[in-house]
Amino acid sequence: MGKKNRKGKENNAAKTSFLKVENIKNTNSGLELPSQDYTNVEEKESSPKTDFPLITKEHVNTKTDSNILDYPTIGDLVSSVEKLCVLKELKIAFPEVDDTLIKAILIASQGVLEPAFNSLLYYSSPEENTDFALPMKPISVEDYSKINVSEILQREIFDDIEDEFSGQGINGSMVISKIESELSSLAEHIGNISTPGSNREVAESTRNVAVAEGHNTILSNEDSILKGKEKGKEEEKEKGEEKGVNSLKGAAVKVVAKSLKNNRIPVTVKRNEPSNNLFDVLNCDESEEEEEQDVETNTSNQERKNQGGNTEVPEAQRDSADRLPAKDDGGYKSAFGTDSCGLFAADAKDEKKQVHPSRQELSFT
């Protein structure tokens, strides 16, 4: 009985150990052992396929190696930078900076102008950072589309007008206000402008109107200045003529006063026209002689004044000058001689025959 029990225990221990080995073998599903036997073909086909991670790792490594070979070298970057037009522009803008530094900055900025320019600007003057820097973010098309086209045209027109009138020294604020009103009226009639051709035409027309108004204002100012000058000249001329007339009037008054003082009224005779009056004919030569006597008396009075003597004419001379011509037997005699005009004969015998018939004819006619 005892031997049988021992044999049964040994058999049980062998069975348990065999089961343990099978469990260990079954836990490693990824490994295939040659000692493993499959009972059926279906179980072999249903078993999972094994993967080889080492093989996959080697395949990944080959891909990374190919990518590393595709990267450019420093020489490739330098050669690509040297072909850029930006390099020439930066050399012109910063002649004091070394070429290698400019190329290095272009490589760092990946060939973009704005960051390269700003970095070189800081390098050239690090203490003075007052220069204008280029914007790093370019303006997109969407941002530009938000701006109204009419506003851009107005700004361009105003800039052109300010440039034109600043050279002429004219204040363009009034003109700009007029243009703004005109643009508003045009916008009401035309509406929002979309095509660039119509925008250009409107801009040119408004600009021409503004320039024409500016020239008209200049011409009106010049005309007003010229009219003022001409008016001043005419006023001066009128004043001069009034002064001349007043001086002539004063001289005439002096002559009349002088003649009244001397109790003589000057008689003017038109010698070119024939006279029917007998006394005009008789006084044809007396007026000239009286003028000569007046001149002589004036000169004598002036000499007496200079000598300090009396300037008054004696009464005897005045009486002789004021006396009427007297009749004489020798014919008609004037105050200055006999028959001065040559109308009467000098013989006294023929006086009644020649003078009286003429008087009768004059009385009857």
Swiss-Prot record:
One of its GO terms (molecular function) is ubiquitin binding. Signal peptide: none annotated. It holds the Pfam family CUE. GO terms for cellular component: cytoplasm; prospore membrane; prospore membrane leading edge. This is Donuts protein 1. It is found in: Prospore membrane. Residues 286-295 have a biased composition (Acidic residues). PANTHER family: TOLL-INTERACTING PROTEIN. InterPro entries: CUE (IPR003892), Cue5/Don1_CUE (IPR041807), UBA-like_sf (IPR009060). May interact directly with ADY3. Probable component of a spindle pole body (SPB) complex composed of ADY3, SSP1, DON1, MPC54, SPO21/MPC70, NUD1 and CNM67. Residues 28-49, 215-246, 286-335 are annotated as: Disordered. Residues 224-244, 315-331 have a biased composition (Basic and acidic residues). The gene is DON1. Involved in the pathway that organizes the prospore membrane (PSM) during sporulation. PROSITE patterns: CUE. Residues 82-125 form the CUE domain. Keywords: Cell cycle, Cell division, Meiosis, Membrane, Sporulation. Its main location: membrane. It comes from Saccharomyces cerevisiae (strain ATCC 204508 / S288c) (Baker's yeast). One of its GO terms (biological process) is cell division.
